[in-house]
């Protein structure tokens, strides 16, 4: 023992508190949507096995309780069938095997179906959807590690290990007391079974067993709720990222910052050039606040009206301001402005289907009025 003045004796065996710290030290950032999506594609989702087991046990126990008369009747039927033919049946007769299989399927299929559906329902409750991933069932030999120290560290000296140990102790204790008090309340009924028939005794014992199963199942559902929230927190912690990992992911998604800066400068240059081309337009068609499209038409060398500038929000405001300063017609036409903005690139001709709408606008311009009068 190591003693210090004014202190309590310290044991030689000291547990390193770092064993209880987060294993992924330095990972302080919450996982991004991309990482969560990749984990989901790999079949890794927050899931409580206790909640799955509790759901399966609850619904299976309820089904057994409700189907008890049917199960008892079928069991008696199969016993009667084989016992009444025991002396006359031939071992070489394969028909008896199929009779047994038929009885077995009638007894097992309903319960198996309920267990399957309840298991799927538990997963849907936890993840709001049905998830199937082939990656999660592929063998991963890299997970087989001979690191015994790490195994014991994770199993006994980690937050998850301590939580699982405490959870198991509480569940065992609670199940024991629930079963004990349920049976103790009906303990005196066991004495009266000596004076009743075998069928009544079996019925009473199965009813009591079903009651215990239902109570224990409900208890397990209640106990599985904290485990569900704990597993969700552990899942998020396991996917946490360092700041460098977040930066790398953003770089992969959006490209290198230098490339993004170059692209942004090119886009700004195009916007400025587009705005300058506004002064060459004959008309500016607006949304009126969100979009602005400048259209030019010179019959002498153009086969169709051409979009020379366009923009949204701030760029649209600049285009309208330049058009107003240059005395260019600004025409409000929401459907046409939206269609030209989304479908026609700068420098491209306007599609034929919009000619009728443009003709109505261009006839308001003096130069096209003169051109039309000359044609007449």
Swiss-Prot record:
SUPFAM superfamilies per record: EscU C-terminal domain-like
Bilayer-spanning residue ranges: 51-71, 97-117, 161-181, 202-222
Localization (cell): Cell inner membrane
Membrane topology field: Multi-pass membrane protein
GO biological process, one term: bacterial-type flagellum assembly
One GO CC term on file: plasma membrane
Keyword Cell membrane: yes
InterPro entries attached to this UniProt entry: FlhB (IPR006136), T3SS_substrate_exporter (IPR006135), T3SS_substrate_exporter_C (IPR029025)
PANTHER family the record matches: FLAGELLAR BIOSYNTHETIC PROTEIN FLHB
Name of the protein: Flagellar biosynthetic protein FlhB
Lineage, highest ranks first: Bacteria, Pseudomonadati, Spirochaetota, Spirochaetia, Spirochaetales
């Amino acid at each position: 023992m190591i003693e210090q003045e004014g202190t309590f004796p310290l044991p030689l065996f000291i547990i390193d508190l770092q064993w209880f710290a987060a294993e992924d030290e330095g990972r302080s950032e919450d996982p991004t949507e991309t990482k969560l999506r990749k984990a989901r594609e790999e079949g890794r989702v927050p899931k409580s096995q206790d909640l799955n087991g509790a759901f399966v046990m609850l619904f299976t126990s309820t089904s057994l309780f409700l189907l008890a008369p049917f199960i008892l009747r079928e069991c008696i039927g199969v016993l009667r069938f084989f016992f009444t033919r025991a002396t006359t049946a031939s071992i070489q007769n394969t028909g008896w095997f199929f009779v047994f299989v038929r009885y077995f399927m009638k007894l097992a299929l309903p319960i198996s179906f309920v267990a399957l559906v309840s298991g799927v329902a538990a997963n849907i409750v936890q993840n709001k959807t049905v998830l199937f991933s082939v990656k999660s069932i592929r063998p991963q030999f890299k997970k087989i590690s001979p690191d015994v120290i790490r195994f014991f560290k994770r199993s006994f000296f980690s937050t998850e290990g301590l939580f699982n140990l405490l959870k198991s102790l509480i569940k065992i204790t609670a199940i024991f007391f629930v079963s004990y008090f349920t049976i103790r309340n009906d303990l005196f009924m066991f004495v009266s079974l000596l004076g009743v028939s075998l069928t009544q005794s079996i019925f009473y014992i199965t009813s009591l067993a079903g009651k215990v199963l239902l109570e224990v199942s409900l208890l397990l559902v209640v106990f599985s709720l904290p485990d569900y929230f704990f597993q969700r927190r552990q899942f998020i912690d396991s996917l946490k990222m360092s700041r460098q990992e977040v930066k790398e992911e953003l770089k992969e998604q959006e490209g290198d910052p230098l490339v993004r800066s170059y692209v942004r400068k090119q886009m700004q240059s195009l916007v400025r050039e587009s705005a300058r081309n506004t002064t060459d337009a004959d008309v500016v068609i607006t949304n009126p606040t969100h979009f602005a499209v400048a259209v030019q038409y010179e019959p002498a060398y153009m086969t169709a009206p051409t979009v020379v500038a366009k923009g949204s929000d701030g760029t649209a405001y600049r285009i309208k301001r330049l058009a107003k300063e240059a005395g260019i017609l600004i025409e409000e036409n929401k459907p046409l402005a939206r269609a030209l903005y989304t479908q026609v690139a700068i420098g491209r001709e306007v599609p034929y289907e919009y000619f009728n709408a443009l003709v109505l606008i261009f006839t308001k311009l003096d130069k096209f009025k003169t051109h039309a009068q000359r044609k007449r």
